[in-house]
């Protein structure tokens, strides 16, 4: 199967922009569907990328914008809000639009441990969304990553910003486990599967090479950014109460449903060889290889260097 035109739904986000850049480098035409065109500023200069502002939840608009594409990648996901509309109804509309336009190839981003019996509404909705994809008549591939890190992420960068302001850090769910996976590894796996028939009808768990507790990740970020930090790990009850309080603050750093999601460790089965290696031949990138390169901008020296670079100074 030769893929020449790809539509990325939710392509203006962290993962979508990385995939779009890699596809553009391969001279594959990319159509980005997004709610806000300004979110994809870095893509506007790419000659093979077309950024279209649209209402992706409108079946008519969606159907019109899938005309002429060879494959669709759905990256739309939220951590808070209307999970049913975003994670279940939208995939159903995408499947319908693909069938309407003869687009047989559909790649779908889910989440590690997504299940109709999941510990949270988020994981259950992701599981229901997978069911919609699997039951379609399309050539589908589902990806279930752990937390994704890389330049521009909203995970390590969030902690980097918080530790600058909080010398004492009350950390909910400090023992929750994660297996962070590098954005470039995720993007390469998705692109590799586009035209690979052996990935049709399959689901892949994407994890990095190491497992960390949430406490270890926050401590690592504070070390890299040179911020002295005292972490107070909260037990289950206080973690839940913290999430409930944060849920009602602007920005929603945490919600009760996020807390419930973290009751299930975001790690791959330690008895299985990583799908990144086994299926895609990608050696998972260690967090320590990459994170310092972008977290350094959250240090006083790094911020000074960033300002100097933007001012065009070399010394």
Predicted regions: what they are:
Residues 177-184, 204-224, 233-244, 283-286:
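Substrate-binding strand-loop-helix patch
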Residues 2-26:
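N-terminal Rossmann NAD(P)H-binding glycine-rich loop of SDR-like oxidoreductase domains
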Residues 29, 78-79, 84-136, 140-146:
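Conserved Rossmann-fold NAD(P)-dependent oxidoreductase catalytic core, especially the SDR/UDP-sugar
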Residues 120, 141-160, 177, 212:
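Flexible, glycine-rich beta-alpha linker
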Residues 160-173:
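A short C-terminal helix-loop "cap" of Rossmann-like NAD(P)-dependent dehydrogenase/epimerase domains
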Residues 38-100, 112-118:
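NAD(P)H-binding glycine-rich loop region in Rossmannoid oxidoreductase-like domains
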Residues 154-155, 173-195, 201-205, 216:
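Substrate-positioning beta->alpha
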Residues 237-315:
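A hydrophobic C-terminal alpha-helical subdomain
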């Amino acid at each position: 199967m030769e893929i020449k035109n790809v539509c990325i739904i939710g392509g203006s986000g962290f993962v979508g922009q990385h995939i779009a850049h890699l596809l553009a480098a391969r001279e594959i035409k990319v159509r980005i569907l997004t709610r806000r065109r300004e979110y994809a500023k870095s893509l506007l200069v790419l000659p093979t990328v077309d950024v279209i502002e649209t209402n992706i939840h409108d079946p008519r608009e969606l159907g019109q914008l899938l005309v002429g594409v060879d494959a669709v990648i759905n990256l739309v996901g939220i951590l808070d809000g209307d999970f049913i509309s975003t994670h279940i109804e939208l995939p159903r509309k995408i499947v319908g639009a693909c069938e309407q336009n003869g687009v047989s190839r559909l790649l779908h981003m889910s989440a590690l441990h997504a299940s109709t019996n999941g510990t949270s509404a988020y994981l259950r909705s992701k599981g229901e969304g997978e069911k919609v994809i699997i039951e379609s008549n399309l050539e589908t591939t589902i990806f279930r990553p752990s937390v994704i890190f890389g330049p521009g992420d909203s995970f390590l960068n969030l902690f980097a910003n918080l530790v600058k302001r909080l010398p004492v850090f009350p950390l909910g769910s400090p023992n929750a486990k994660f297996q962070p996976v590098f954005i470039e590894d995720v993007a390469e796996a998705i692109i590799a599967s586009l035209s690979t028939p052996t990935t049709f009808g399959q689901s892949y768990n994407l994890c990095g090479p190491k497992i960390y507790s949430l406490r270890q990740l926050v401590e690592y970020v504070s070390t890299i950014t040179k911020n002295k930090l005292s972490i107070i790990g909260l037990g289950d009850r206080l973690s839940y109460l913290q999430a409930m309080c944060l849920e009602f603050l602007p920005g929603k750093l945490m919600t009760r449903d996020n807390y419930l999601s973290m009751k299930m460790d975001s790690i791959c089965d330690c008895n299985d060889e990583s799908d990144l290696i086994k299926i895609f031949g990608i050696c998972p990138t260690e967090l320590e290889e990459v994170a310092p390169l972008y977290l350094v901008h959250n240090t006083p020296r790094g911020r000074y260097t960033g300002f100097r670079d933007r001012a065009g100074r070399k010394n």
